[in-house]
Amino acid sequence: MNHPDAGEVTCTYDAAGNLLTKLTAELKKTISDKAAISYTYDYERLSEVLYPKNLFNRVTYTYGKPGAKYNRAGRLVLVEDASGGEAYYYGNQGEVVKTVRSVMVSQADVRTYVHTATYDSHNRVRTITYPDGEVVTYGYDAAGQVTSIRSTKQGKEEIIVAQVGYDKDGHTIYTRMGNGTESTYAYDRQRERLQGMLLTANGDSIMQTQYKYDPVDNILGLTNVITPKAPKKPKGPGGFGRTDGTGGPDAGKDKEEKPLGGAFSHTYAYDELNRLVKASGKAKGIGYAMDMSYGLMGEPLTKVQRTDSGSVAGSYALAYEYGDADHPTAPSQIGHERYTYDANGNPTLVEDDSLNTERRMAWDEENRLTALSDNGKTSRYTYNAAGERVVKSHGYLEGVYVNGAPQGL
């Protein structure tokens, strides 16, 4: 496989079609043409992935032996990777009922996170218990569609989603959230496209959006015709309308705050290849217009945006240059920023000559960002076998992510 920016990727397979090796352009350039990612199998089940450059990214897969407890026979029971490991436990229908995630933040700091789940007879998730003890419960209708979600933690129950309604085609037409806000949705019955949405709270309309499309489903327009009422700041000590005699001339009166959101309109235009070429709109009295142009290979050539606010950040004109013969469709310069790439097409250096700043990036064999140096301030990232970021470190701070959700520092 050969890509104009990512270079050549060479793969080998066994007689059963299983991937055995993968050699990328960057590995070939920086190590050798023998330095490929290798894959090992156990009866056609992937058992190991080895990396020639970042050896600690090694991934191993362990499967349950005959007679294994917790219905693990023949199923994946453990995955070990650079971030730690994850063990799986199964129910009678093969559903995952428990996972134990061990995250190696550092050599001296290993943290464990346990998730459990229960299912109904249709193998639908009924409850999920999170590492902090929160239990989330799902309700379904006769068609198996989610109708409610509630949370219980430390004996306190909170409603996340109170009600969901569907039409005969399975489209969501109504939702009522735990905070009382309600949304109704309208669809184009011929193309099943969303045409409008009305959001209300406490009987007041907050947002009413309408969508317009062209014959190939590109969005041509998006409008909101409602500006919500300004919320009132309550009376009381420390606020407007103080009762201690220090509230000034407005003491004892409610004072309105600025409303959130407001009416807006956006319109879009496309060329014959369905590429966005124009956009314009207005929100909170400020309008904008944007134009783009493209080259023969679909690469952006120019982007010009103008706003009524006069903001330098909001109005700009960018020209895209493509001066790197090894990456013909990757920009070598956008405005004041100059880009350098590795052989796989990942950006490794971004220099801004107007601000005299630079960002340096490092990537692993799977093209995952492993380090970012922003003017000398470095962040590092560790991933699991699925490619999800699990650990982010910045200076002395290290953050952990499980299933994409932050778990704190």
Q: What do these predicted regions represent?
A:
Residues M1-A6, T21-K28, E48-L55, R75-Y88, ...:
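Beta-turn initiation residues at beta-strand->coil junctions
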Residues C11, I37-Y39, Y61, Y88, ...:
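A residue-level detector for well-ordered beta-strand positions
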Residues L27-K34, A68-N71, M104-V110, P228-G261, ...:
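Intrinsically disordered, low-complexity Ser/Thr- and acidic-rich flexible linkers and loops
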Residues A35, N57, G84, Y113, ...:
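Beta-rich catalytic cores
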Residues Q210, P215, G221, K232-K235, ...:
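Extracellular beta-rich repeat passengers
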